[in-house]
């Protein structure tokens, strides 16, 4: 699982994200399962099939580096945004990859269901019909929102699924912690003026307090630091040093405190430079040896744990359970 990826022209954003997915052992084990491979091939899932072939090279090919040419080509054919040699945003790519992979796995499941119907396997059909994909099982979580009318105290509840939490960074400091960013994301907000919400009891727009919390945290918690923003008419990058630990406890942000709230860091996407001339790299922990590796396209080097913390961190991937050796 330690294999560099060649840069085929501003593809560092793709390489960094692929390295993180390649280090997500439960996903890799599922995709490299022989049954999954056969079903993906049979249902003609383009991205899923190409991604599996790349994972096989990276995990079992014995290569020091390889070129994800097919993966990039398929990506570009599905979404034209990635069909060029321009630098792209790694977080947008990760969301897109997970969505397409999720759709491919649903398509694969649908194809399998049709086969089972022909074979009359009703019990398997019933079980598979309710089955979510490996992507949603690992990466999806659920947030809940409670809105409180400041006039009549009426409460309304809603929920939303997510795969990545995009966290604001405090702007009044040069250094903060990842917990500060999470607190900023989950802090209660008061909607006033033009942002007032329509109260179903009052029948009027009223000042509203919004409370947000995590109802169902995901197995893989992906945190995106919102480093890119606007200052007036200019796009800027926030270079705040966001401090983070190898362990993260999210209990202050959970709706139910008895849930498992402890996570372990296993991958980081770094961004150096600015918006126009930037470069992405990845840091990933090996499940087999426990050591960390720095992936700079095709260049790979082993690093100490203290190297992982840096002001370049752009995305952090945490796992709720320790990965088992594959």
Please provide the spans of the model-predicted regions.
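USP/UBP deubiquitinase core
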Residues: 1-118, 159, 166-169, 180, ...
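Cys/His/Pro-rich metal-binding microdomains
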Residues: 6, 150, 197-200
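Structured, non-catalytic alpha/beta "coupling" segments that mediate domain-domain communication
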Residues: 136-156, 217
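Glycine-centered flexibility sites
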Residues: 1-4, 9, 141, 203, ...
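Residue-level signal for mature regions of secreted extracellular proteins and peptides
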Residues: 5, 142-145, 192-195
